[in-house]
């Protein structure tokens, strides 16, 4: 059958790109905070939800996982994949309260790649959810849980058309950075990494090369780095330098210090935008589409 021609003067309908977005459920590092001085940017620890078309991919499960889990359960989400950057408390503390774990019809794949041969993802989950630290273990969860492991540097394909590139970051106990490619676009997750002043980490540059969006560990300020050397974190100024060097389109600052107030983060965001217009401070519940 011949393709119908568009009417004279009309514009042929283009197929829209599939949805590719990142939702920030938690943007703090260290521990959750609350109070009037934290209302604009929020106080939940790291948890992110990515939509690649119909597929749901989570990154980390800090305290933001509580709200994320309730929203996904209400939506009727039955299948998702969760990748851990690492297993410090502010990145896994919300996992036992993640509602899809307790939905019998749900299927979850949990992945980690920062521990090498020291511990598997399954062992990490079992060690975290056990007495005397927690009243129940993973066996109480009624969802189907498939715990898997990878090695930093591996390229993963969790769903058709979705490619995830991984790389090791500079953090005590290790952490993994991710670059997700879907529909000709890319988003990178770079949290919990310490830079050496005056240098740009080649592993980070590879993950963020010409990326549409990356979120980055901005716990400290450049002038604070000497005081906190060895803590495993970076700065918003380094994020801007990386974005400029890599040809990135947008960079979002995450892993805000639990001491950083709304007024301070607003000041940081304004200063960053003067240097790189695509920079912003991430906020709890913010959605960014690429």
State each model region's role.
Residues 59, 85, 190-191, 216-218, ...:
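Active-site flanking residues adjacent to catalytic metal/cofactor-binding acidic residues
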Residues 1-11, 236-243:
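Generic low-polarity alpha-helical segments
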Residues 113, 192, 256-257:
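Short strand-loop junctions, especially beta-strand C-caps/beta-turns
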Residues 186, 196-284:
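Cap/insert and terminal regions of metallo-dependent hydrolase folds
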Residues 3-188, 199, 204, 266-290:
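Binuclear metal-dependent hydrolase catalytic cores
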């Amino acid at each position: 059958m011949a393709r119908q021609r568009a009417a004279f003067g009309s514009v042929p309908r283009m197929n829209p790109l599939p949805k590719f977005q990142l939702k920030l459920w938690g943007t703090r590092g260290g521990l959750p905070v609350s109070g009037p001085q934290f209302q604009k940017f929020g106080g939940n620890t790291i948890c992110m939800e990515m939509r690649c078309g119909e597929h749901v991919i989570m990154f980390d499960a800090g305290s933001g996982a509580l709200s994320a889990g309730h929203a996904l359960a209400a939506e009727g989400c039955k299948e998702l994949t969760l990748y851990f950057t690492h297993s410090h408390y502010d990145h896994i503390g919300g996992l036992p309260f993640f509602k899809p774990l307790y939905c019998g019809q749900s299927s979850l794949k949990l992945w980690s790649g920062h521990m090498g041969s020291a511990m598997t993802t399954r062992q990490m989950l079992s060690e975290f959810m056990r007495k005397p630290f927690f009243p129940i273990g993973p066996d109480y969860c009624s969802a189907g849980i498939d715990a898997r492991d990878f090695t930093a540097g591996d390229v993963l394909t969790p769903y058709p058309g979705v490619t995830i590139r991984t790389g090791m970051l500079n953090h005590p106990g290790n952490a993994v950075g991710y670059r997700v490619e879907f529909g000709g676009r890319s988003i990178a997750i770079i949290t919990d990494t310490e830079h050496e002043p005056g240098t740009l980490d080649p592993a980070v540059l590879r993950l963020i090369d010409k990326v549409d969006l990356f979120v980055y560990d901005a716990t400290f300020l450049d002038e604070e780095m000497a005081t906190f050397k060895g803590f495993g974190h970076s700065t918003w100024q380094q994020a801007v330098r990386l974005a400029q060097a890599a040809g990135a389109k947008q960079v979002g600052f995450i892993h805000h210090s639990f001491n950083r107030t709304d007024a301070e983060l607003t000041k940081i965001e304004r200063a960053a935008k003067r240097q790189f217009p695509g920079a912003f401070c991430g906020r709890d519940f913010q959605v960014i589409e690429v």
